[in-house]
């Protein structure tokens, strides 16, 4: 039994295999022949955070592959009343063949995987967003024809998206430069991981450095879910850390831009026209 809790738990070959399978499933879907690999399987979608794209893509994808996806709002479950995560995990594991869990604490996803007895996939935590980044890598490869050797830049908050992008891009042989203000660096263990890649990774406070010569640029929200009280301070701290026409001019002419949305003020309107969302 395997879980997908963070990208660093995978090998580069495993990531490539996932992308290859996803490409084939996409081809089959366009041809009108969805594979039914989940026929007779029940998947729990346990969400403790708001979601539009993650929930929608999972529910539709599970349905197209013949499975049953059950949306479970954590706010409506006994876990909201203090039930230990291990008890919830054991119960869900008896009914479902796999569980996707979207929540705040990475430790809660880890605990669910430890006690459920079925495969667990992270639908996002405050530490990582592996599904989003696998999809990002799939999109980059589709538009660029490859991953290895590309230059990727990230401008914004060194939070969950940045953590997973650093790991995923470096494992795929890409150069990665992240620009974030002081006090908003990626997690210490992710930076330790990135050091193994030497000059292929750079951390800076200068957004233009991340954009210069980039094949693909990523950004993210400045205020993630659960941080709403910090909105005004973060707007001040991240002033200038956006993708606009001047910054895009530093990237390669065929650079693509990816944002997990909501995009709001992090990306200018002209840049939106070049975005692959």
List each language-model region with its residue ranges.
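Anion-binding alpha/beta catalytic cores of soluble intermediary-metabolism enzymes, centered on
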Residues: 90, 97-168, 259
């Amino acid at each position: 039994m395997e879980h997908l809790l963070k990208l660093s738990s995978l090998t580069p070959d495993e990531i490539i295999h996932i992308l290859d399978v996803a490409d084939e499933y996409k081809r089959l879907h366009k041809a009108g022949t969805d594979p039914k690999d989940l026929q007779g399987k029940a998947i729990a979608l346990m969400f403790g955070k708001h979601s539009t794209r993650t929930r929608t893509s999972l529910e539709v994808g599970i349905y197209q592959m013949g499975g049953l996806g059950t949306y479970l709002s954590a706010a409506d479950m006994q876990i909201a009343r203090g039930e230990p995560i291990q008890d919830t995990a054991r119960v869900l594991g008896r009914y479902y063949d796999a569980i996707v869990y979207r929540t705040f604490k990475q430790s809660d996803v880890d605990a669910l995987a430890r006690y459920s007895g079925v495969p667990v996939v992270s639908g996002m935590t405050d530490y990582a967003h592996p599904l989003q980044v696998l999809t990002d890598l799939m999109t980059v490869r589709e538009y660029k024809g490859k991953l290895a050797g590309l230059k990727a830049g990230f401008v914004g908050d060194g939070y969950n998206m940045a953590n997973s992008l650093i790991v995923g891009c470096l494992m795929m042989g890409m150069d990665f430069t992240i620009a974030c203000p002081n006090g908003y660096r990626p997690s210490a263990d992710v930076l330790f991981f990135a050091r193994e890649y030497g000059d292929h990774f750079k951390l800076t406070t200068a957004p233009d450095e991340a954009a210069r010569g980039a094949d693909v640029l990523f950004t993210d929200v400045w205020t993630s879910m659960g941080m709403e009280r910090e909105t005004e301070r973060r707007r001040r701290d991240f002033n200038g850390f956006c993708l606009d026409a001047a910054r895009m001019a530093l990237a390669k002419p065929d650079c693509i831009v990816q944002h997990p949305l909501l995009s709001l003020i992090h990306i200018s309107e002209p840049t939106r026209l070049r975005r692959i969302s």
